[in-house]
């Protein structure tokens, strides 16, 4: 297991900027609005050949509102989980009451943690002089840095990583986890789903749409298979995104889909499927990802023995050509079908990466063609000679024929349905290419 480094501090001291500086990418959302990073956000990093996990947190804030209290709880959980804590302060703002409270908490309650006291935004000679006052706080000797410009960050990382032993396992560790993007419109229950699976309040859950702003990775193991759950801010209509933060969050959702193996598209059972839901599903299909539709809050629906069947029939009538996407009725609150959803997603991932030998495919083709005759066009008959699978991240099949222009839509659909039925390719897009031979 890679060592975990947590960035903690009050809102807007530059935690996300330092997070991005260390990882050399724009990963956490950076904005001058306090509280932009609400949840614990974890990413893998490397410095001087040593690998680690870096955790960005929502700011430590003693305000009494619901979100601030939840952010405080997340900060405390981050400290408990971490091997090393970077306590970040802001030289421009000086030491605040929150800084002193957090510092005392770290020294009193978490004295066994390895602590690095860091003063950020030291970007001018005058600010360097101002930073000297932080030495008298009684905390560990501070590091003076500028996360924005990068000054002092390398020296800080050298000292932090110096104490982290590198194991052979760490060097040889390979990524074999199945990546699942939990996506959907705001407030459909994505974070509750992740929290129920992980058994801890990993993400801030609130009935306020948009509570989860970043895409946040969580790892867990089920039946000896490692999974990475990517929880995202809900995708809203572009017309409703009236601020930069919401734009970045929606962009993060799209990127989460791009890097996942299977998209878990979550709907609220009450309103049912809407245009924006279809947009999200199509986003996964266009990127050739596996897809699973989760109908959440099923426990709140009045139902009888036929309700789920009627609901699914209505749902599929609005889904057009996406009948291959499986549907599961779940409840993040009662945990109904939660683990079945993960098992189904694992099967979809396996379907997506399945390799079928050419001999098996051509035996299938011979059997399929014995039940139908390809239609003719302009008096010319389509003749398929053989087929094979092309190496790709999803099932791509090449059919070699006398004239690709003779292939009509109904015959293409016939072959797709037969392929899905015969090889159990549920939940994954199929590409078929007809080539002249």
UniProtKB/Swiss-Prot annotation:
Function: GTPase that plays an essential role in the late steps of ribosome biogenesis.
Annotated EngA-type G domain residues: 3-168, 178-353
SUPFAM superfamilies on file: P-loop containing nucleoside triphosphate hydrolases
Residue positions binding GTP 2: 184-191, 231-235, 296-299
Subunit record text: Associates with the 50S ribosomal subunit.
Keyword Glycoprotein appears in the UniProt entry: no
GO BP of this protein: ribosome biogenesis
Amino acids binding GTP 1: 9-16, 56-60, 120-123
Highest taxon of source: Bacteria
Name assigned to this protein: GTPase Der
PROSITE patterns for the chain: G_ENGA (PS51712)
UniProt domain KH-like: residue ranges: 354-437
Annotated TM spans: none
Pfam families given in the database record: KH_dom-like, MMR_HSR1
InterPro entries: G_ENGA (IPR031166), GTP-bd (IPR006073), GTPase_Der (IPR016484), KH_dom-like (IPR032859), KH_dom-like_a/b (IPR015946), P-loop_NTPase (IPR027417), Small_GTP-bd (IPR005225)
GO molecular function ontology, one term from the record: ribosome binding
Family: Belongs to the TRAFAC class TrmE-Era-EngA-EngB-Septin-like GTPase superfamily. EngA (Der) GTPase family.
Keywords per UniProt: GTP-binding, Nucleotide-binding, Repeat, Ribosome biogenesis
């Amino acid at each position: 297991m890679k060592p975990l480094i947590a960035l903690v501090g009050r809102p807007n001291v530059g935690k996300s900027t330092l997070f991005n500086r260390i990882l050399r990418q724009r990963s956490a959302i950076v904005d001058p609005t306090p509280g932009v990073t609400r949840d614990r956000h974890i990413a893998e990093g490397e410095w001087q050949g040593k690998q680690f996990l870096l955790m960005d947190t929502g700011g430590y804030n003693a305000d009494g509102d619901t979100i601030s209290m939840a952010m405080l709880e997340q900060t405390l959980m981050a400290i408990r989980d971490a091997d090393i804590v970077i306590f970040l302060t802001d030289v421009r703002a000086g030491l605040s009451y929150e800084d002193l409270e957090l510092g005392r908490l770290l020294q009193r309650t978490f004295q066994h943690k390895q602590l690095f006291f860091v003063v950020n935004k030291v970007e001018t000679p005058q600010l360097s002089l101002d930073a000297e006052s932080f030495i008298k706080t009684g905390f560990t000797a501070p590091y003076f840095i500028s996360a924005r410009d990068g000054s002092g960050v390398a020296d800080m990382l050298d000292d932090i990583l110096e104490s982290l032993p590198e194991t052979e396992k760490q060097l040889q560790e390979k990524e074999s986890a199945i990546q699942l993007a939990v996506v959907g419109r705001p407030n459909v229950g994505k974070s509750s789903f992740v929290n129920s699976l992980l058994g801890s309040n990993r993400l801030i859950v609130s009935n306020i749409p948009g509570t989860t702003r970043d895409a946040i990775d969580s790892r867990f193991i089920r039946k000896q298979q490692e999974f990475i759950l990517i929880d995202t801010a809900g995708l809203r209509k572009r017309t409703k995104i009236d601020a930069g933060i919401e734009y970045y969050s929606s962009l993060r959702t799209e990127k989460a889909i791009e890097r996942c193996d299977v998209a878990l598209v979550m709907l609220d059972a009450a309103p049912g499927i809407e245009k924006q839901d279809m947009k999200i599903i199509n986003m996964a299909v266009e990127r050739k990802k596996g897809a699973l539709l989760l109908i959440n809050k099923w426990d709140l629906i009045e139902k009888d023995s036929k309700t789920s069947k009627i609901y699914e029939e209505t749902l599929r009538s609005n889904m057009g050509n996406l009948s291959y996407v499986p549907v599961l009725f779940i409840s993040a609150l009662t945990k109904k079908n939660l683990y079945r959803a993960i098992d189904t997603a694992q099967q979809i991932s396996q379907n997506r990466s399945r390799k079928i030998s050419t001999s098996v495919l051509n035996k299938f083709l011979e059997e399929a063609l014995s039940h139908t005759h390809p239609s003719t066009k302009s008096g010319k008959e389509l003749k398929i000679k053989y087929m094979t699978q092309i190496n790709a991240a999803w099932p791509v099949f090449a059919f070699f024929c006398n004239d690709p222009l003779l292939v009509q839509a109904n015959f293409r659909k016939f072959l797709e349905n037969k392929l899905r039925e015969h090889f159990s390719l549920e939940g994954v897009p199929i590409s078929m290419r007809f080539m002249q031979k």
